[in-house]
């Protein structure tokens, strides 16, 4: 799976969690985060911002390379775990 595919798939999951569990609103991931950031821990917001920035660069910048794939995936894992309701874990 290419970096673009992996990034898009992971961010779609996070977007869905933000919309369904936190009633986030907006077009992009940054807007979704902004709409519900008061209800999220600061460390999660920081990770989400990192994820959103990487996603935008991967999708919109032709020459962007995902240098820290492991770090990106770890941030996604941490955010998905934090955003998933405890009863669903």
Write out the residue ranges for each language-model feature.
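Amphipathic alpha-helical interface elements
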Residues: 1-53, 60-89
């Amino acid at each position: 799976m290419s970096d673009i595919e992996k990034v898009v798939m992971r961010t779609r999951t996070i977007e869905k969690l933000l919309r369904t569990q936190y009633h986030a609103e907006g077009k992009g991931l940054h807007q979704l985060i902004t709409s519900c950031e008061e209800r999220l821990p600061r460390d999660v917001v920081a990770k989400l911002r990192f994820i959103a920035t990487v996603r935008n660069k991967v999708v919109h910048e032709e020459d962007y390379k995902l240098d820290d794939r492991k770090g990106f995936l770890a941030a996604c894992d941490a955010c998905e775990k934090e955003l998933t309701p405890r009863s669903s874990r």
